[in-house]
Each structure stands twice: as structure tokens, then as C-alpha cells.
A protein has these predicted regions:
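N-terminal auxiliary segments of SAM/dcSAM-dependent transferases
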Residues: 2-67
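A short glycine-rich, Lys/Arg-flanked "PGG" loop and its adjoining helix->strand segment in the class I
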Residues: 143-160
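Conserved catalytic/acceptor-binding region of the Class I
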Residues: 137, 158-252
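Short SAM/SAH-binding signature in class I
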Residues: 126-134, 160
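Short N-terminal helix/helix-N-cap motif within the alpha/beta-hydrolase-1
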Residues: 139-141
Length: 305
């Protein structure tokens, strides 16, 4: 098991943001709305795949590609679209249980409506690269999931898996964060819900490394990145990243909490809304310098198995 390689540095704070009285200035929301609102709905022909015994079966293309890439849990398909644009000679497949992908996509990209927890129906050893991210709380059996990654990679193929640490932190040393702080309480509630569901939200404990190693990957690399939430950093790149992550989190907090905390832990809607409001306020508070860790694990299947 590898030790995470740290990439954290002491944050430099943009005074214009950190001294603002309204944390909203840390989130440049208008920049991202146009792209979100332009997302088209998925075509009816793709939706029809659900009627085939609840499974998706895609007709194989006859064109030969140099690379074959699988994006598991593709969501809106944004990563798959970007990678298909960047590598037009590759065949890219995105899978997700929900039909939230757009209809306008590069010609070398297809989406399958599929449940990644079931046995995958692709040809074994048929992908050069398998990409996974943001699947926290979505998988019952991670060892099985990783064994499928290994099974469907070609010899010499690579996988990459990225998950955020659900416990955010304050990068301001003057802010006290104890067990009563909303960042700690928020994370613990998700840990409790995950334990009850049998679907973990914990990815900072080296579990991804172990799953990969146990499935057959001989050498696994684990990198940990610190990312800001909000535009408080003085570094231009981190400021832009913080605006993206802050906006994404701002839109997602309600959706994150309703099922695991409301349905699984039995909180009322009003209680969940209060919790979300507290979390949103803390993330927006410029004094907190809100940040979090992103865990990236990757490895290569042996060229001969």
C-alpha cells in the first residue's frame, strides 16, 4: 500500500476575498450558469436500452480505434466529452445509472445506461484506460468493483480513481475546529449513513490503495491534493479552481444531504435544511478559508498476466 504523496502548501489568501463581509464574493456563479443551462437531454433511443432486461447492450462499432477508454459513473458526461475531444482517435464509453448526459457529443463517444455494481458486460481485457471519480456512497462492494476494473483492462492498461475527503477543513489556523464544528458534524453524519447503508464515504484511510492492490495491481500510486472551496487564494490557478469547486459544492449540498441524512438517518426535511444552511454558511464564510483533500489513486495492469 502506498503512502499518499502530499501536495499541500501554506495557502496565500486574497485580501479582497478574505476581508469581505459577504462570502458570496468567493463564488463567481454567473460564469458557470450558461454551460449548465445549455445541457441537452439524452436521446430517446438511449433511454430504450433500459427495457432490455434492465441492462444496456450497445452495438459494437466496426471502426478500429487506437485506444479504448471507459468512464464509470460518468454523470453529466463532462469528463468523457473532454477526453473524447482531446483524443479523437480513441473510442470513449461513459456509463451511468441515470440518463443525465447530453445528446450533442463527439462522434467517438457513446453513453450506456448501466449499473456499475452489476457484472460488466464488456469484453474482458478490452480497455486501455478506466476512469472513476465521485462514487462515494454509491458502491456496495468496492473489492468487487476493483476486480472488474482489473478484469476489463487490457494488459498494460491503466486505471485512475479520484474521490474527495468529505470532511472539509479550515485553512485559517485562528479558527477552532472541534467535534462540534459543522465540518466535523457533516462528515460524521455521512460516515454514519454510509455504515448503515453499507456504502462507505471514507476514502482518506488508504482503502482505495488496498482494493487496487488486492485486485491484482502490483504498484499503486496514491496522491493527495489540497483544493480550496471559494476564490480566497491569491494564486490565480487555485482561485479559479476554488470558484469551480465552491460553485459545485454550493449547488450540491442539498442533494448530498437529502437521502443519506434525511432518508437513511431519519432526519426531517426541516432538520436537513437547517444542517445544509449551516454547512453552506461555513463554506461561504471567508474567515474559514475552506479547503479539502482530493485523493487520487492510479495503477497499471501488468503487461502479462
Amino acid at each position: 500500500m502506498s503512502t499518499p504523496q502530499e501536495t499541500q502548501n501554506q495557502p496565500e489568501v486574497d485580501a479582497n476575498v478574505s476581508e469581505a463581509g459577504d462570502g458570496d464574493s468567493a463564488f463567481d456563479a454567473e460564469r458557470f450558469r450558461s454551460r449548465a443551462e445549455s445541457t441537452a437531454s439524452i436521446t430517446s433511443s438511449i433511454l430504450e436500452y433500459r427495457t432490455i432486461r434492465g441492462r444496456t447492450y450497445q452495438t459494437s462499432k466496426t471502426t478500429e480505434y487506437w485506444y479504448r477508454i471507459l468512464d464509470v459513473g460518468t454523470g453529466t458526461g463532462i469528463w468523457a466529452i473532454d477526453i473524447a475531444d482531446k483524443f479523437p482517435g480513441a473510442e470513449v464509453i461513459g456509463t451511468d445509472i441515470s440518463p443525465t448526459q447530453p445528446s450533442w457529443v463527439p462522434p467517438n463517444l457513446v453513453f450506456h445506461i448501466d449499473d456499475a455494481q452489476l457484472d460488466w458486460t464488456f469484453e474482458p481485457e478490452s480497455f486501455d484506460f478506466i476512469h472513476v471519480r465521485y462514487m462515494q456512497g454509491a458502491i456496495d462492494d468496492w473489492p468487487k468493483f476493483y476486480s472488474q476494473i482489473f478484469k476489463f483492462l487490457k494488459p498494460g492498461g491503466w486505471f485512475q480513481h479520484m474521490e474527495p475527503d468529505i470532511e472539509l477543513r479550515c485553512d485559517n489556523p485562528d479558527v477552532k475546529v472541534d467535534d462540534k464544528h459543522i465540518f466535523k458534524r457533516w462528515a460524521q453524519l455521512f460516515y454514519d449513513a454510509g455504515d448503515k447503508l453499507g456504502r462507505t464515504f471514507k476514502f482518506a484511510d488508504g482503502s482505495m490503495d488496498k482494493w487496487a492492490s488486492d485486485s491484482g495491481f502490483p504498484q499503486v500510486t496514491h496522491k493527495k491534493f489540497s483544493i480550496p472551496y471559494g476564490g480566497w487564494s491569491k494564486d490565480d490557478n487555485l482561485k479559479a479552481l476554488g470558484n469551480y469547486t465552491g460553485y459545485y459544492l454550493d449547488l450540491s449540498l442539498d442533494g448530498f444531504a437529502v437521502y443519506p441524512i434525511g432518508q437513511v438517518l431519519g432526519w426531517t426535511l426541516e432538520e436537513v435544511q437547517v444542517l445544509v444552511a449551516q454547512m453552506r454558511s461555513a463554506v461561504h464564510d471567508p474567515k474559514n478559508l475552506t479547503a479539502g483533500d482530493m485523493h487520487l489513486v492510479y495503477g497499471q495492469k501488468p503487461k502479462s498476466t
